């Protein structure tokens, strides 16, 4: 994906606005937006978190707040590219947690989790489970694209 792997940050505003439009019903009911976090090492190497960029644009378009501290990636995982569904699930198992300082941003709140691409759903499920364990009342997921089985077409 050009945004994530091609440093095409110029694509983020358009992508974020499309996501805000497509997810307007989810966002209308949400208390806050949570981007899928990167492990600090991956963010340092990439220099940005594409999900956080999209979340900021979506928040601006929808009038919602982004809670960057609500969810942390506590385990450095290998990239998911090329992994099957069960390998992806195993890869992110235990990778996400609501930190003590993020509890207030989560407890009792309706959250919308933001990511760029949904492939197997393993990352979204891992994040949603962590947020629900952390006290969120509900978690919806909003992504820019979904990979369909058998397809490797560029997005």
Go through the PLM ranges and name each one.
Residues 1-113, 120-155:
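Conserved PRPP/pyrophosphate-binding segment of the phosphoribosyltransferase/PRPP-pathway fold
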């Amino acid at each position: 994906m050009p945004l994530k792997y091609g440093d095409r940050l110029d694509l983020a505003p358009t992508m974020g606005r499309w996501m805000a439009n497509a997810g307007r019903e989810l966002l209308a009911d949400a208390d806050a937006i949570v981007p899928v976090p990167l492990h600090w090492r991956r963010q340092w190497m990439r220099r940005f978190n594409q999900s956080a960029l999209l979340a900021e644009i979506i928040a601006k378009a929808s009038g919602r707040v982004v809670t960057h501290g609500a969810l942390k990636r506590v385990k450095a995982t290998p990239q998911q590219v090329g992994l099957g569904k069960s390998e992806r699930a195993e890869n992110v198992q235990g990778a996400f947690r609501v930190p003590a300082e993020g509890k207030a941003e989560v407890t009792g709140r309706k959250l919308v989790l933001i990511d760029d691409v949904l492939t197997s759903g393993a990352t979204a499920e891992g994040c949603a489970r962590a947020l629900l364990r952390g006290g969120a009342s509900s978690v919806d997921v909003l992504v820019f694209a979904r990979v369909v089985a058998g397809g490797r077409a560029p997005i």
